[in-house]
Amino acid sequence: TNDSIVDSLFRKAGIVCCHNRQELTTVCAIFMHPEVKGKNVAVITHAGGPAVMLTDVLSNGGMDVPHIEGPKADELLAKLFPGSSVGNPIDFLATGTAEQLGYIIDACENDFDNIDCMCVIFGSPGLFPNWEVYELLNEKMKTCKKPIFPILPSIINVKDEINDFINNKGRINFPEECIFGNALCKI
């Protein structure tokens, strides 16, 4: 039988077909988060390249990364450093702060009805420790109704912060945006 036929039958039955262990563990980790109720994703980042790659994977996999605009988007942009973008992906630059990430998450949660979940890519630009950012991310994940998926790629240079996020806060990290994106599209 053709794999696409089997995948279609499984999808109709609510079964997610995975083709390797990495895909399986990533899909399982996504299931550990609140259910995504739609196909509209906000990609939030301080690193443009990974956001573009994730956006491409999501779009190619059937998810939408809708453009964000209007007065609420303008209000959010005014709270970010010059050069930032809120069009989606939302890029608040390598110098972006935990406070600014909080503004972005709050806007996606409360102001942008065309967003169903958030993917936050936050590594380490090497400018400052990430403790405050990961603490804020943990708190927002507790309070937001829309799922937030942390993509924390800097597993070497901020390993202590990521270990705390995983081991002490009980969170899951998706260290690679494209693997995460492909898994999210399967669900």
Predicted regions and their residues:
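Short, well-ordered alpha-helical scaffold segments within catalytic/effector domains
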Residues: 25, 101-105, 134
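Peripheral docking tails and interdomain loops at the edges
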Residues: 1-66, 135-187
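Short, glycine/charged-rich beta-strand-loop motifs at protein surfaces that mediate ligand recognition
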Residues: 123-125, 150
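Glycine/threonine-rich flexible loop motifs
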Residues: 126-133
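Conserved short-loop catalytic and cofactor-binding motifs
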Residues: 12, 89-92, 125, 168
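Short glycine-cluster motifs
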Residues: 37-116, 120-123
